[in-house]
Amino acid sequence: MIKLKLPDGSVREHEVPLDGLAFAESIAKSLAKKAVAIKIDGQMKDLSTVIDRDAEVEIVTRETPDGVDLLRHDASHVMAEAVQELFPGTQVTIGPVIENGFYYDFARAEPFKAEDLEKIEQRMREIVDRDETITREVWDRDAAVEYFKKIGEIYKAEIIASIPAGEQVSVYRQGNWLDLCRGPHLPSTGKLGKAFKLTKLAGAYWRGDSRNEMLQRIYGTCWANENDLKAYLTMVEEAERRDHRKIGREMDLFHLQEEAQGSVFWHPKGWRIWQALEQYVRRRIDAAGYVEVRTPQLLDSKFWEQSGHWGKYRENMFVVPDEVPSTDEDAPVLSGKAKLMAIKPMNCPAHIQIFKQGVKSYRDLPLRMAEFGCCHRNEPHGALHGLMRVRQMTQDDAHIFCTEDQIKEETEAFVALLESVYEDMGFTGTKLRLATRPDVRAGTDETWDKAEKALEEALKALGKEFDFAPGEGAFYGPKLEFHLRDAIGRSWQLGTLQLDFVLPERLDASYIGEDGNKHRPVMLHRAILGSLERFIGILIENYEGRFPMWLAPVQAVVTTITSDADPYAEEMLQKLRDAGIRAELDLRNEKINYKVREHSVAKVPAIFVAGKREAEEGTVSIRRLGSQQQQTMKLDEAIKALAEEATPPDMR
């Protein structure tokens, strides 16, 4: 007799072992029809897996997140089979599931063309119609290497050869086609359905290393049903329309260029948004009891070795010698004794150095230390994406040094501050995730137990709902992630709160406790916006460039119908600027409709229009962005109303 416990807590008993599909049928035939896999003690397995012991069991259906991921996994295999049928001689490499879809990398002499995607998609539909049975086989590792070499799959053979000798490997057979894979998979290709779409072509280096050969990557998306697929494709279309790079050009906010990959050239209008954000955050953290600091960009590699970052982040750090030749000809005569210096990829170790200056007492805690810290990370060229993924970034970074007893209170205060900031930015409904210890980590299990428990208890005390993200914590401590949804439904991970018992120990930070002895402070790493670059990119796309008045780079443009009103327009401009409004003047000899249209395209919230009559009466006609109507007001009243609207939320 085996006892199988379901997620609702109920237990079902079976006299003989049975596979996942039979177990689903024993509950309900309708459930068995929806089933795509089974979870046994939290591990995803094929439906054909036999359950022969007591276990916690969950039937995975296609509509669940795990089910959708499985569909995407199978879609990548069906795509690979279709590619090899249509383009014989193509080698397959890897094909993982990614957010909202999947991809597969192929090795092929000739490049794929955009029109090939429709052919591949059509063949995928045919493979689904064939309803090919998918079965798992276990092979000897060496035999698998030889087999894949024999059929010309050099990349697969290389992957298998990296598995320790003597181990077995799993291969999935899909009709007459097979692939190396851990699984699990659907019972057959017919279970996949046809709610998939191939989306784009790209290049990718084998194993992500630019020294290796270039492969061809095909991206796709797959969903549980056609409605979900259509909704996603509509969202993608809307996202393309809102692309911050396109809007950034149209609004003259910033640009990027090859000579400074991953770094942003901020134009005056874009820099105004940056400054408005930075000043807003500075006021909020000042009111919350933070002190602001500034730390060096370059630090000795020994410093990073001590902190533990050298071993973890070395390949993502920009490293330079502290002895630089004066000319290119002098380069070969470096002494070889130069120290290696790293441009900081993060601020936390430097903040500990400030904390360590002078003796700290328990009375000094909590100490909340903030920095708009400019950091550099050596991101791969192919990963860079506008403002969303850069090499040079500025973070609204802060570290809270506190006692263990203060963790709950500090977490509560931070969450309240963060949610207030997001609300001011127009975001509501923050989703929380608690990311726990990764496989590669610093510190002992005992330390991690303490850190994870402290953060979990603080969240429960706040009454906040949260999900666990096993294995996704930082290498020095568990992490609380804050996710937002934008205007078109996309989720963005922005704020973080990371609990760290490790770094203060490594860098010997201490304070004198009430007992007169030295103690290690707890270190809370926290950010609200994340990087300002990325947050501005998100704001651009969320608002489609139509920023709320207080963030708009140009809040008002003054323009004229005839040149007779030019002196009055100049007077209006000065009054607007005196009221603290970011205003510009347009006295061009163009038709008023043309000028209004141009400034509307530039997303200016308010256009002040003046003609001869307005000049004589001391009034102004106001056209608001997105409205076809004009409102005529006394100039002073209009400026007062606009100034109130332009006031940052924390100053109202």
UniProtKB/Swiss-Prot annotation:
Binding site for Zn(2+): C348, H399, H525
Listed EC numbers: 6.1.1.3
Gene Ontology CC, one term: cytoplasm
Cofactor note: Binds 1 zinc ion per subunit.
GO biological process, one term: threonyl-tRNA aminoacylation
Alphabetized GO MF terms: ATP binding; metal ion binding; threonine-tRNA ligase activity; tRNA binding
Gene3D superfamilies found in the cross-reference section: 3.10.20.30, 3.30.54.20, Anticodon-binding domain (3.40.50.800), Bira Bifunctional Protein, Domain 2 (3.30.930.10), Threonyl-trna Synthetase, Chain A, domain 2 (3.30.980.10)
Region spans: Catalytic: 243-548
Keywords: Aminoacyl-tRNA synthetase, ATP-binding, Cytoplasm, Ligase, Metal-binding, Nucleotide-binding, Protein biosynthesis, RNA-binding, tRNA-binding, Zinc
HAMAP family (UniProt xref): Thr_tRNA_synth (MF_00184)
Protein name per UniProt: Threonine--tRNA ligase
Record organism: Parvibaculum lavamentivorans (strain DS-1 / DSM 13023 / NCIMB 13966)
Source lineage: Bacteria, Pseudomonadati, Pseudomonadota, Alphaproteobacteria, Hyphomicrobiales
